[in-house]
Amino acid sequence: MSKQSLSYKDAGVDINAGNALVEKIKADVKRTTRPEVIGGLGGFGALCAIPTKYKEPILVSGTDGVGTKLRLAIDLNRHDSIGIDLVAMCVNDLVVQGAEPLFFLDYYATGKLDVDVAASVIKGIANGCEQSGCALVGGETAEMPGMYHAGDYDLAGFCVGVVEKSDIIDGSKVRVGDVLIALGSSGPHSNGYSLIRKVIEVAGINPAEEQLAGKPLADQVLAPTKIYVKSILQLIKHADVHAICHLTGGGFWENIPRVLPKNVKAVIDESSWEWQPVFKWLQEKGNIDTHEMYRTFNCGVGMIIALPQEDVDTALGLLKQTGEKAWVIGQIEHATDGEEQVIIR
């Protein structure tokens, strides 16, 4: 009896589908290229030179995912913007240290590769890279039968940027009297989604059908994370920025102290802005304590920037010119030993 000849495809891995995906995304990837990138897709490793304008360049790296926002996107069959979220979570972490993102790589894993879904996701990644001036230089598409439920996939991103050593922003310059400027968020960004999904479950609603402030709730919870790279890089050329905080997991209470030296505190004026409807809806439907809201969500604030009083008007003007919603949200005050470093009142 002759034995059946098995192939990789029989085992659930379709190499032709992977090749079709590469062809489908080539044009999107090409649009993200930078002059420092050497070669194109397909090499074993991606090559990138450091821009010549840097005298003492320091590389800054970051990696992230999008949490369970991905679960919501998959359940709602909305794959076009989750890639933007992936890039945003990485490049926003880099720019808070003054770094210009150089290149990005992604990891896409699934049980059975759906070329159209994967292409939609990677198109979003390319979009995010364009928004941040970052080259998409490669990635890994892993088709792994038996590892994921049908239709599911997972994402991770990795980014490298560069900053002049003398221009690193690390919070060490923060002083009592510094003013805090907020940059508005586009929504929950990519944090707090396990709680968002729980609220939706408890409320018993379909986010695609539920209307909130004239738009489907799905549009509001899946709004792509705002990318602040270009506006912040422009700002730090013209203002003496002492610290920048990216409000991600842990919200106000955990992220702001990461950029503060000892013996100072950030005093936030919560009357300086109004929460977007999606945050009010979440608090009401989930009966969520305000302290928990500030710990879980950005509540409408994507970034907080600390700078001297004399730079405030210049900073606000520049940020608004670059399309940001920016306002004074608080100030830096002296803190005694053991005192909380974030006060919201």
From Swiss-Prot:
MF GO annotations: ATP binding; phosphoribosylamine-glycine ligase activity; phosphoribosylformylglycinamidine cyclo-ligase activity
CC per GO annotation: cytosol
Major site of localization recorded for this protein: cytoplasm
Presence of keyword Secreted: no
Cellular localisation: Cytoplasm
Coiled coil location: none
Xref: SUPFAM superfamilies: PurM C-terminal domain-like, PurM N-terminal domain-like
Reactions the enzyme catalyzes: 2-formamido-N(1)-(5-O-phospho-beta-D-ribosyl)acetamidine + ATP = 5-amino-1-(5-phospho-beta-D-ribosyl)imidazole + ADP + phosphate + H(+)
Pathway the protein contributes to: Purine metabolism; IMP biosynthesis via de novo pathway; 5-amino-1-(5-phospho-D-ribosyl)imidazole from N(2)-formyl-N(1)-(5-phospho-D-ribosyl)glycinamide: step 2/2
Cross-referenced InterPro entries: PurM-like_C_dom, PurM-like_C_sf, PurM-like_N, PurM-like_N_sf, PurM_cligase
EC numbers, comma separated: 6.3.3.1
A Gene Ontology biological process term: 'de novo' IMP biosynthetic process
Superkingdom, natural source: Bacteria
Enzyme class per UniProt: ligase
Keyword list, A-Z: ATP-binding, Cytoplasm, Ligase, Nucleotide-binding, Purine biosynthesis
One Pfam entry name: AIRS_C
Family, per entry: Belongs to the AIR synthase family.
NCBIfam families: purM
Protein's name according to its UniProt entry: Phosphoribosylformylglycinamidine cyclo-ligase
Biological source species: Pasteurella multocida (strain Pm70)
